[in-house]
């Protein structure tokens, strides 16, 4: 029997491709394709969906996640915009409900490897900044991938970065800061998704860069998340925990 999946945000570019991918996979049945005017909770009940893949917007992803969990389905969240306090609340709710879920800042396996390599490098390089770039339809900044990368680096590095007595002549010139790591966000036509993690040391730099040039690169990660989430009883933040 195929696993019943709802794709929420099915009319977007990622949503259309996710529907096509899951419909062509022998393990899954897409039982509903939802957009913003549809009732997510009622659709879960009507279709008896086991998984909801959320590919919507930053301004509604938290409420969508609560709805999915409270209606007994497993969330696979590919929408950025969740802050740490919201992730903590969703983690607690999944524990109470004993239901699995996945929040994936990035579904690209290459991007996950980039984050893992950057985490390893941070054990040896304490000076690091992140430059992320996306298309202009992505209205939240910085990206979920950049935030997650900063969190992973902060947890792994063995000494704090140098405190520089800099004065910003233009406010924001040094980017935003997350876990004491500067993040610079680009929004340009011609970009899909790009991230560079740039490390510096005396006499050298190390650059770890990943480029997504086609949304198809995210599909293996969506399939992997849908396969793994059925066996979880907790919320997992980051696809790297499933590799």
From Swiss-Prot:
GO terms for cellular component: cytosol. (S)-2,3,4,5-tetrahydrodipicolinate binds at residues 135, 144-145. InterPro entries: DapB_C, DapB_N, DapB_N_CS, DHDPR_bac, NAD(P)-bd_dom_sf. Keywords: Amino-acid biosynthesis, Cytoplasm, Diaminopimelate biosynthesis, Lysine biosynthesis, NAD, NADP, Oxidoreductase. It is an enzyme of class 1 (oxidoreductase). GO terms for molecular function: 4-hydroxy-tetrahydrodipicolinate reductase; NAD binding; NADP binding; oxidoreductase activity, acting on CH or CH2 groups, NAD or NADP as acceptor. Its EC number is 1.17.1.8. GO terms for biological process: diaminopimelate biosynthetic process; lysine biosynthetic process via diaminopimelate. It comes from the Bacteria. Pathway: Amino-acid biosynthesis; L-lysine biosynthesis via DAP pathway; (S)-tetrahydrodipicolinate from L-aspartate: step 4/4. Belongs to the DapB family. Catalyzes the conversion of 4-hydroxy-tetrahydrodipicolinate (HTPA) to tetrahydrodipicolinate. This is 4-hydroxy-tetrahydrodipicolinate reductase. The gene is dapB.
